[in-house]
């Protein structure tokens, strides 16, 4: 059986109250000064502030536009679903190592599914993770199609924004997890000169250097470029593991007039070492070992010669042309090739765990020793994935009487091929590890004893074609969004070992409807219904691939986005159900069967505000009540890794006057409630709170405008905690205190 790469969801029962009161006199981003004109006085009128674009930078931490929820450049308050945007401005405050770290203050998103590991950006959104072993992440509106262990990640330094859309999204994107998706927006060329160099050094021997250059190539701004890159090396938290990353993203824009834009986008990333990607048992983490002690937070159960590497190549473009005031055509296209290679020994629970009931090594131990000897397995894996995606859209703006329409019609196509050449070690393929006196040694990954290991050589192919239509119809203050999509999703799996092929072709219609009411004061209540479908990659006892799971959601919410202030406050109540979930065979076979159901009900609140030029505040609260409502084994239980409560609060203050002028001080806290550690709900992972801090100094005062030096601290008090568990044998230590010094120079 293949080693599971993706952790699954969970529950929690503790209550938290977070009260934030902020009193601020009315402020605006822009200030005006009125001077009574005198004779012969020349009056200069300032140009209006540039309009924020859904595909460009936001001036503050509170983005007002997004295309993730509609595929059109839409104000956030007009989208009938919950959307959170983490801007480059906000990422600069925290300097995250990964995109999932950048989302730490975002509601409805669990980022601790792998603890301190940043190998992948795995997320659980509204209680649901992506099916199987894949992420549900997008870049510039196109899915970063992954398969098995072969998932791409993007470095946050390369991004303009990271956006979370919560709830089913199949009406626009086709097959998808019901919980929602992550869409990242690349940095794009500017016509204004940008020259940035950045240096970082910190905990775990971190050293990183990055650069970001952009400018127009001609006097008229018809041609422009951007070149962003970085190199990073560090030790992972777990002893003996390393992280190395080299990335570069060349981009080029041709804009012959104000109606046409063609931007070439590319991304190349090489990671000789992606860091630690193992797991630990609940004994020694959540619970003490029989000797009363716990494993250290830097414990590594793998072999000394474990390796995990990844290489990513992506090229594509974004094109849009406005024919007139009515019609605009857009097309996004990308070709990607990803390679992943690993030799990994990983833990599989202590010998007393039922998961090791068939281990001969464990059976040979005395009963008193089974609680502190760790069973281990291994995987040798080489994969090559190729993916082509294209999305073509026609936007039409017109009116029918008093109703203004933004009509979007589109067709997208995706083709993926992943060639997997793997070998899995089963029970007794790796020597046991004494957790009282662990000695990590090299492992012979070439041994491949057929008595306890075997090949896994699979060629997976997937295709998806979708046609969709969406109308955003506004009459006075009432906005109705209605959309539908029809998908043809095909998948084929060739087993090179058995010489067999499994195929499945699915056709699915999904739709979304929503109503928003736009009050003049910036308050917008809304209601929506949306659907999703998600094909399975697993095979049943009849040898056929399972039918897709389906999701449906009802959401009621309110958004507050005042016209003249950079403030975005949202709140939502949702009821989300995933049907046709896989569950254990009631007849007792080792195969799963269809027919399960999971329901998640939740409440989310988020506030992002640049209250003044000096003050930023970000706060969120999440309540999720998830439950297996239909299941052979787990009915009534809560999925693993889904805390019932999460909350966060961040604030920073910048001094502009006096001796502290240029200094920024910031601090924040992140609370994650307790969660269940396995689908059987046999144990719980405790709640935890970590505190972050920032000290930054703007070097403009010493003649270096746009440059700064900063000190970022995550987990300020070095709280030791277990981030989550997906089973009794799979738990993850949370990140230790991270101290990073950053120097950013612009010239």
Where in this protein do the model-derived segments appear?
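Acidic, small-polar-rich N-terminal luminal/periplasmic segments of exported/outer-membrane proteins
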Residues: 3, 39-193, 197, 532, ...
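Conserved C-terminal beta-signal and adjacent last beta-strands/turns
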Residues: 16-21, 29, 383, 406-407, ...
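Outer-membrane beta-barrel translocator/receptor signature
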Residues: 157-160, 171-250, 256-260, 313, ...
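Face-selective signature of the C-terminal outer-membrane beta-barrel domain
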Residues: 315-337, 376-494
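Gram-negative outer-membrane beta-barrel transporters
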Residues: 477, 575, 594-678
């Amino acid at each position: 059986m293949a080693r599971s790469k993706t952790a699954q969801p969970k529950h929690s029962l503790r209550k938290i109250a977070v009260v934030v009161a902020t009193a601020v006199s009315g402020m605006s981003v822009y200030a005006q000064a009125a001077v009574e004109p005198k004779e012969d006085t020349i009056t200069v009128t300032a140009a209006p502030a540039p309009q924020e674009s859904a595909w460009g930078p936001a001036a503050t931490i509170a983005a007002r536009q997004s295309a993730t929820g509609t595929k059109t450049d839409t104000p956030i308050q007009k989208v009938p679903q919950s959307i959170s945007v983490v801007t480059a401005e906000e990422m600069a405050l925290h300097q995250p190592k990964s995109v999932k770290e950048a989302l730490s203050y975002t509601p409805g998103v669990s980022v601790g599914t792998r603890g301190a590991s940043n190998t992948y950006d795995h997320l659980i959104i509204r209680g649901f993770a992506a099916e199987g072993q894949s992420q549900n992440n997008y870049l510039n509106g196109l899915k970063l199609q992954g398969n098995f262990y072969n998932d791409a990640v993007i470095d946050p330094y390369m991004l303009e924004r990271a956006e979370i859309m919560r709830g089913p999204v199949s009406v626009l994107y086709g097959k998808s997890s019901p919980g929602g998706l992550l869409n990242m927006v690349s940095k794009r060329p500017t016509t204004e000169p940008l020259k940035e160099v950045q240096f970082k050094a910190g905990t775990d021997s971190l050293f990183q250097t990055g650069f970001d250059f952009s400018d127009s190539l001609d006097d008229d701004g018809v041609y422009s470029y951007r070149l962003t890159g970085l190199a990073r090396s560090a030790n992972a938290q777990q002893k003996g593991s390393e992280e190395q990353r080299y990335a570069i993203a060349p981009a080029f824009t041709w804009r012959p007039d104000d109606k046409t834009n063609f931007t070439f986008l590319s991304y190349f990333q090489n990671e000789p070492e992606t860091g630690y990607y193992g797991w630990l048992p609940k004994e020694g983490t959540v619970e003490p070992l029989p000797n009363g002690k716990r494993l250290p937070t830097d414990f590594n159960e793998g072999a000394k010669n474990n390796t995990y590497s990844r290489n990513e190549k992506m090229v594509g473009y974004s094109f849009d042309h406005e024919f007139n005031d009515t019609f605009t055509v857009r097309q996004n296209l990308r070709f990607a090739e990803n390679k992943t290679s690993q030799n990994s020994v990983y833990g599989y629970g202590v010998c007393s765990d039922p998961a090791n009931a068939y281990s001969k090594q464990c059976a040979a131990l005395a009963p008193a020793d089974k609680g502190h000897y760790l069973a281990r397995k291994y995987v040798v894996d080489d994969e090559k994935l190729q993916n082509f995606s294209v999305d073509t859209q026609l936007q039409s703006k017109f009116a029918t009487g008093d109703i203004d329409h933004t009509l979007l019609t589109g067709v997208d196509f995706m083709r993926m091929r992943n060639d997997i050449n793997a070998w899995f070690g089963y029970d007794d393929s790796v020597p046991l590890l004494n957790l009282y006196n662990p000695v990590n040694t090299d492992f012979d990954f070439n041994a491949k004893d057929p008595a306890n290991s075997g090949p896994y050589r699979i060629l997976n192919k997937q295709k998806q074609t979708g046609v969709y239509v969406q109308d955003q119809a506004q009459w006075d203050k009432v906005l109705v969004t209605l959309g539908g999509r029809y998908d043809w999703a095909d998948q084929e799996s060739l087993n090179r070992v058995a010489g067999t092929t499994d195929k499945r072709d699915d056709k699915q219609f999904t739709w979304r409807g929503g109503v928003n009411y736009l009050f003049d004061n910036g308050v917008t209540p809304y209601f929506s219904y949306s659907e999703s479908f998600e094909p399975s990659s697993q095979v049943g006892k009849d040898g056929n691939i399972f039918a897709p799971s389906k999701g449906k959601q009802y959401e009621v919410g309110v958004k507050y986005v005042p016209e003249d202030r950079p403030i975005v406050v949202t709140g939502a109540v949702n009821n989300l159900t995933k049907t046709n979930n896989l569950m254990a065979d009631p007849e007792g076979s080792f195969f799963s069967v269809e027919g399960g159901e999971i329901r998640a009900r939740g409440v989310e609140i988020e506030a992002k505000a640049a209250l003044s030029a000096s003050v930023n505040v970000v706060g969120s609260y999440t309540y999720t009540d998830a439950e297996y409502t239909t299941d052979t084994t787990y009915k009534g239980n809560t999925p693993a890794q889904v805390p019932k409560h999460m909350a966060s609060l961040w604030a920073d203050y910048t001094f502009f006057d006096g001796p502290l002028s240029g200094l920024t001080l910031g601090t924040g806290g992140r609370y994650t409630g307790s969660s269940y550690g396995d689908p059987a709900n046999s144990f719980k992972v405790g709640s935890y709170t970590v505190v972050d801090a920032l000290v930054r100094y703007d070097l403009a005062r010493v003649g270096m405008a746009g440059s700064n030096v900063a000190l970022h601290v995550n987990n300020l008090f070095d709280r030791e905690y277990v981030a989550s568990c997906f089973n009794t044998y799979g738990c993850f230590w949370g990140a230790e205190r991270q101290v990073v010094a950053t120097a950013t120079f612009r010239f």
